[in-house]
Regions:
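Homeobox/homeodomain signature
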Residues: 4, 8-10, 37, 106, ...
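Conserved SGNH/GDSL esterase-like catalytic core that processes O-acyl groups on lipids
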Residues: 49-140
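Short low-complexity stretches enriched in small and charged residues
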Residues: 25-28, 80, 163
Length: 218
C-alpha cells in the first residue's frame, strides 16, 4: 500500500516541479513562475491525505527544499460537507504542514478558514469524496461554493485552484458506495474521468492532478 501511495504521489510531485520551473499556458489563475517558495494546500479527505503524505520525501530526494505543503483532512469529507463545516466555522479538520520537507501537526481541531488563511498559498487543491466522485449532481453548487470560500480566506488573491481526480475502488472492494457504480472499477473510473472533465471545465479549473489515472494504470 505504501508503494502504491508513493506512485500516486508522483502526480503531486510533478505539480510542484512544473510550477517551480515552467509557466502554465492557460490557468484559472497563473501558477507562479520560479517562485522563491511554492506553497500548496490540499483540502480533502483520506485521498488528499494519502496523495500528499510522502511528497516531502520525494521533494527532498529531488533536492527541492523551497516548498511549503499543507493538508487539511477530514475522513470521507465531500464537497457539500466542506461547505457545511465552513458555514458553521466548525473545527472539524486535522491540519498538517510541511515547511522543511517534514510534516508536523498544526492542529487537530482546525477550521477551513484557519488553514486556508495560514499561508499565502499559491495552489489550493480540492477534491470530491470518492463515493460521489463519479456522480455529477453531487458537485453543484458545492464545488463553486468551496472555491469561493477558499479564495475568500486565502491571503493570496491570485492563488490557483487545482483539482485532484481520485481513483476508482479496486475489484472486490466492500466500500458501501461501490454499488453506485455496479461494483465495477472500470465503470467507476470512466465516471470519475468524465465528471472531472465536465466540472473542471465549468468551474474554470485547468490544473488537474490525475492521481486516479496513475492508480488505474498500475
Amino acid at each position: 500500500m505504501k508503494k502504491l501511495f508513493r506512485f500516486a504521489l508522483c502526480a503531486f510531485a510533478l505539480l510542484a516541479v512544473l510550477t517551480l520551473r515552467a509557466q502554465s499556458e492557460a490557468p484559472n489563475f497563473p501558477l507562479p513562475v520560479r517562485p522563491d517558495t511554492l506553497r500548496i494546500l490540499g483540502v480533502g479527505n483520506s485521498f488528499t491525505d494519502d496523495g500528499m503524505m510522502y511528497l516531502p520525501e520525494l521533494l527532498e530526494a529531488a533536492g527541492i527544499r523551497n516548498v511549503v505543503l499543507g493538508r487539511l483532512y477530514y475522513p470521507g469529507c465531500s464537497l457539500r460537507q466542506h461547505c457545511e463545516f465552513d458555514a458553521a466555522d466548525a473545527p472539524k479538520y486535522t491540519y498538517y504542514k510541511s515547511e522543511r520537507n517534514r510534516w508536523t501537526t498544526v492542529s487537530e481541531a482546525a477550521t477551513l478558514r484557519e488553514a486556508v488563511g495560514d499561508e499565502r498559498w499559491d495552489v489550493l487543491v480540492v477534491q470530491q469524496s470518492s463515493a460521489y466522485s463519479g456522480i455529477y449532481t453531487s458537485y453543484h453548487p458545492w464545488l463553486e461554493r468551496l472555491i469561493e470560500r477558499v479564495r475568500f480566506y486565502c491571503p493570496n488573491a491570485g492563488a490557483c485552484v487545482a483539482w485532484q481526480m481520485t481513483w476508482a475502488y479496486g475489484s472486490g472492494s466492500d466500500h458501501g458506495a461501490f454499488p453506485k457504480y455496479d461494483n465495477d472499477p472500470q465503470q467507476m473510473y470512466a465516471a470519475v474521468v468524465d465528471v472531472a472533465r465536465r466540472v473542471t471545465e465549468e468551474c474554470g479549473i485547468e490544473t488537474v492532478i490525475p492521481t486516479g489515472t496513475a492508480i488505474q494504470n498500475l
